[in-house]
Structure formats: C-alpha cells, structure tokens
C-alpha cells in the first residue's frame, strides 16, 4: 500500500509543530513527513525537540489518526570542511534517535557538499557514513539520500553509484520529481537500477531548464554557477508524471508496503490548502492509472 505524506514546509510560519498532525488530517492526508522547522530543527543545526515534545507530538498524531512516516534533516554530509562533517555526524546521530523514538524509522536527506570540490566532498560523505551506519543499524532506521541541485553529486545515476558503494541496505535513494532535469531525466532507466533501494519519491513539478537552448532561465552575468528548479503543483511544469508513475509500477514500488510518496510543493504558500488537497487527489489518480 502506497503511503502518501505531506511535507508541511509551506505552513512553517503559521502552524506550530504540534499542530501539524491536525493540519494534515484536515487536508485529507493520513501521513506526515517532518521537515526542517524552527521547533523541530533548522538546516545544518542540531534538532531542537526533546523527549517531552516528541511524546506530545506522538500523542497528537495518534489523536488525529495520522502516522509520522519519516523525518527530513538537511546536514553537510559531503562537508567538505572537517567541521561540516563532524557537525553532520553529531546532529544526524540525534535525528536518527528521534526518528526511532517517533516510531518513524526513516530519515530522508540530501548529500550536500560542493560540486566544485567533488572529490573532497565524496570522501567527506563516505567518512560521515562510516560513523553513521552503525547508529542506523543500532536504532533500526533507514537513511535515504536525494542528490539535490548544487550538491557535490547531482546526477541521479552517479548518486546511486555512490550509495551503492556504501555496501549496506541501511542507506537508500530518494527520487525527487522537482529535481528531474538535474538528475538526468532518466526515471525509466534509473529507477529499475535502484530497485528495492528506492526509499521515497517526492512529487512536485518543475520546468526543464535545458529547453530553449539553455536560455529558458537567464542569470547575469552569463555563466553563473547557479541551479534553477521549482516545486510546483503536478502538471504545472515539464515532468512526465505518466512515465514516472508507470516506472514506479513496473519496478514494483507502488506495490510495496513501505512505499512512500511525499507531496512537497513550495511555490503555492498563499494557496497551500488548495494545493495540498489537489496534490493528494492527483497522486491518487496517477497511482490508479499506472
């Protein structure tokens, strides 16, 4: 059974962390992914929840009929500086413990690091994982990585190779729809290769920045080392959702009990309720049609 979760980022400034379960239930969702939030933990920082808040959050989720599936911290696993690596290990160790305490044994995250220092960043990543894999095994938590635009690895296939090199089933891959055109736009060949190591799929649309001879987006001065993508409602961009969900069906992902699809639209804060409800209906439609 596919679990469809909401990323509540659009509500960070208006809804308290403890109210997120009631929010997602009101929007029709049964599942929630916890993402960077002032009360939960900000990008690159140590988490700010204690056991008392975790207990309250679990109680609120149970009362709302909502399951917390996963947590999403962003840490500098790819360094490349030594203090970045040490902070990532220290902070993520606590996030892993929190995930276990929440009964949400999945941590989804990003590689980070710097693309212009790819070799150093990859080494930093492997060193961080050497320290964290024993923690994952001890706590019974899965860690999945998204090659985010401007990380040290952005291409989907190369990211999978890096994950595969860890030689552990405790670490998997996050396929992010809004990163399609940075990943290489190759879902139909990439996802079969990843196979059972696909840990989560995020659904938001984006435009293909390669179109119009690369002039669809213009930054000045020309040649800036920038990355452009969006997190739009499904159908508002260029992602081939029929192909993506067809591939997810063909590879067996949609038939897995632990399948997780997360709606993560960030471009519609002023229409967040309508967007969230639309996304839920559209994801169900795509699953049914696959």
Q: What are these regions, as identified by a protein language model?
A:
Residues 2-9, 32, 130-232, 238, ...:
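Acidic/histidine-rich catalytic cores of soluble enzymes
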Residues 18, 59-64, 77-173, 274, ...:
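Active-site acidic/histidine proton-transfer and metal-coordination neighborhood
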Residues 33-58, 112-117:
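Glycine-rich, proline-tolerant flexible connector loops at the mouths of alpha/beta enzymes
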Residues 272-290:
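C-terminal helical cap(s) of enzyme catalytic domains, especially alpha/beta-barrels
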Residues 11, 259-274:
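A short, acidic, flexible beta-alpha connecting loop/helix-capping segment that sits on the rim
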Residues 21-26, 48-69, 93-103, 130-138, ...:
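Acidic (Asp/Glu)-rich catalytic clusters
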């Amino acid at each position: 059974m596919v679990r469809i979760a909401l990323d509540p980022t659009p509500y960070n400034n208006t809804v308290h962390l403890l109210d997120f379960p009631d929010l997602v239930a009101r929007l029709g969702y049964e599942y929630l992914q916890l993402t960077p939030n002032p009360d939960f933990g900000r990008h690159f920082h140590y988490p700010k929840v204690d056991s008392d808040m975790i207990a309250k959050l679990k109680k609120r989720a149970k009362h709302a009929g909502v399951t917390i599936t996963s947590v999403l911290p962003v840490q500098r696993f790819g360094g490349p500086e030594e203090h970045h690596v040490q902070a990532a290990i220290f902070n993520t160790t606590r996030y892993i413990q929190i995930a276990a305490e929440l009964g949400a044994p999945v941590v989804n995250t990003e590689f980070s690091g710097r693309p212009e220092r790819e070799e150093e960043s990859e080494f930093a990543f492997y060193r961080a994982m050497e320290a964290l894999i024993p923690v994952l095994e001890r706590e019974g938590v899965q860690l999945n990585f998204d090659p985010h635009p401007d990380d040290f690895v952005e291409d989907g296939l190369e990211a999978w190779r890096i994950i595969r090199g860890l030689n552990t089933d405790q670490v998997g891959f996050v396929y992010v729809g809004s990163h399609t055109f940075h990943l290489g736009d190759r879902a139909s060949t990439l996802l079969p290769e990843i196979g059972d190591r696909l840990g989560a799929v995020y659904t938001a649309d984006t435009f293909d920045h390669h179109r119009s001879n690369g002039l669809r987006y213009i930054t000045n001065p020309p040649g800036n080392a920038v990355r452009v993508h969006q997190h739009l409602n499904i159908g508002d961009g260029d992602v081939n959702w029929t192909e993506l969900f067809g591939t997810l069906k063909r590879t067996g992902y949609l038939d897995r009990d632990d399948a997780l699809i997360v709606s993560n639209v960030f471009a519609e804060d002023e229409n967040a309720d309508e967007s969230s409800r639309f996304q839920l209906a559209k994801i169900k439609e795509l699953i049914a049609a696959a």
